[in-house]
Swiss-Prot record:
InterPro entries: DNA_methylase_N6_adenine_CS (IPR002052), HemK-like (IPR004556), PrmC_N (IPR040758), RF_glutamine_MTase_cyano (IPR052663), RF_methyltr_PrmC (IPR019874), SAM-dependent_MTases_sf (IPR029063), Small_mtfrase_dom (IPR007848). S-adenosyl-L-methionine binds at residues 120-124, 143, 172, 187. This is Release factor glutamine methyltransferase. Keywords: Methyltransferase, S-adenosyl-L-methionine, Transferase. Its EC number is 2.1.1.297. Belongs to the protein N5-glutamine methyltransferase family. PrmC subfamily. It holds the Pfam family PrmC_N. One of its GO terms (biological process) is methylation. It catalyses: L-glutaminyl-[peptide chain release factor] + S-adenosyl-L-methionine = N(5)-methyl-L-glutaminyl-[peptide chain release factor] + S-adenosyl-L-homocysteine + H(+). Methylates the class 1 translation termination release factors RF1/PrfA and RF2/PrfB on the glutamine residue of the universally conserved GGQ motif.
Length: 286
């Protein structure tokens, strides 16, 4: 016997509680599939969902049985004021990464024709957000993954930024042109290898390992970026790195030991966690 649409929603709510899933995901799924927000669903009664019942049930079943993130199931993620294409080739953009964009935009507003680098661009979220906030800036978005660059390219095209954001394939600074940049930004892999197995299944099973695993202490990529960034920054340019909770003091120490950098500070995210480490390049290093 076919389950009525309103019965499906009640069952989904019960399953969400059992699997420790935020009930808001159900309304997010409903709105994405039907175009109806929670109020319109309530006003429309059971018939509001009936035409979409089978699709809703199938997607929710995958959410439960495969621990598949809803953003991957739907192919989109809402972040800042953006609706971004995503798939398992890229990380799902997190709210904490918004602080990285804010740092870049605040600094680059005073730079005429700002030149910004986004290392490990993934979905292109940071590059797109910075470019939209700074119409006069040029952004170079770098990633080693061809599959990730396809996703980033779709998001750049979606927001009409193809002339402003340049995609480059390669490891970190390797594919960049030889010119000084105003800002180098990165949300690199920063989770210690030993902690990967303890991640939530939504992350561990579906998000790209190469974008998560930061080596034994989580800072392999951070060290490499610090080593190379100074020679790509203009004097007074900034390096801004997103880090894991608790890594801030160690990254500050790494930068403090490098004479090419100064004025090191940390920026807290929306949850009050030291999430971004920012430093200035004293001079272009060798």
């Amino acid at each position: 016997m076919r389950q009525p649409a309103d019965g499906w929603r009640e069952q989904a709510l019960a399953e969400a509680r059992v699997h420790d899933i935020d009930a808001a995901e159900i309304d997010y799924l409903i709105e994405a599939v039907t175009g109806l927000d929670r109020l319109r669903v309530r006003l429309g009664g059971p018939q509001a969902l009936e035409a979409h019942r089978e699709k809703l049930a199938a997607l929710w079943r995958r959410r439960i049985e495969e621990a598949m993130p809803l953003q991957y199931l739907l192919g989109t993620a809402h972040w800042r004021d953006l609706q971004l294409q995503v798939n398992p080739a890229v990380l799902i953009p997190r709210p904490e990464s918004e602080a990285l964009v804010d740092v870049a935009v605040d600094f680059c507003r005073s730079c005429a024709g700002a030149r910004v680098v986004d290392l490990g661009t993934g979905s292109g979220a940071i590059a797109v957000a910075v470019a939209r906030a700074l119409p006069g800036a040029t952004v170079w978005a770098v990633d080693a993954s061809e599959a990730a660059l396809v996703v980033a390219g779709a998001n750049i095209e979606r927001y009409g930024l193809s002339e402003q954001v340049h995609l480059l394939r390669g490891n970190w600074f390797v594919p960049l042109p030889t010119q000084p940049f105003d800002a180098v930004l990165s949300n690199p892999p920063y989770i210690p290898s030993a902690e990967i197995a303890a991640l939530m299944p939504e992350v561990r099973l579906h998000e790209p390992l190469s974008a998560l695993d930061g080596g034994s202490d989580g800072l392999d990529a951070v060290r490499q970026i610090i080593a190379d960034a100074a020679r790509h920054l203009r004097p007074g340019g900034i390096l801004a790195l997103e880090v894991m909770a608790g890594q801030g003091p160690t990254v500050v120490q790494l930068l403090a030991r490098d004479s090419r950098y100064g004025c090191i500070r940390t920026v807290r995210d929306w949850a009050g966690i030291e999430r971004i480490v920012v430093t200035y390049a004293w001079a272009r290093g060798s």
